[in-house]
């Protein structure tokens, strides 16, 4: 449970958001990163902590909207497309056990799976295998489906994919000259692959995860401090494998690159080198979100 004062503030913000969301439309408005799928995830999180039925009621409305508009989505990926939406609906199913929803998810996962099978393993592109826009995010949606709805489903495919990831990481990290901010990032690079390995099998990938956490950290001067393109996403991976020593090092780097605004608030570096406060992907909100 949240403290009463904080709970009241959160509820007030959500009620304002309801008004805004019913009067405005946005690009990628159904997506996990920018739209209703992410909003649904938040509502379920708030309900699980507060047990306030209001959040679940909003979640019901949001899930219905996602289902009704699912076929309008053009992207397949985790951040903007169908994989992210299905992941949120899978989470929603855990709260409802609704059979109609289960059938919808079951009928929809095939398209994601087919796209996943069509990947060109010969390309070995870090971008193609990335979390936000590549195969890692799609694989995680398949993993969540098999974990919640059909145990052992996709097991062999995900095991093969896991082997591909290990080979890709070895190849990509053997040549550091071409590694820049995005190649090290969560959305398009190595940090996102590390996060997938953490969520897929943290214990089984313990040595690999630690190895590439150190690799990314050793190149942190090429990165900013935000979540999407910066080192904060690497900080999240240290929570999974309890790498406390590296966690402290990353925190020190983030704090060293920060500054105070006119109100004394701690600001973190965005991609532009400036301090961005209210942005999850490139600003301070991503750092807060990790905690």
Regions found by a protein language model. Name each.
Residues 1-291:
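Glycan-recognition and catalytic cores of secretory/periplasmic carbohydrate-active enzymes
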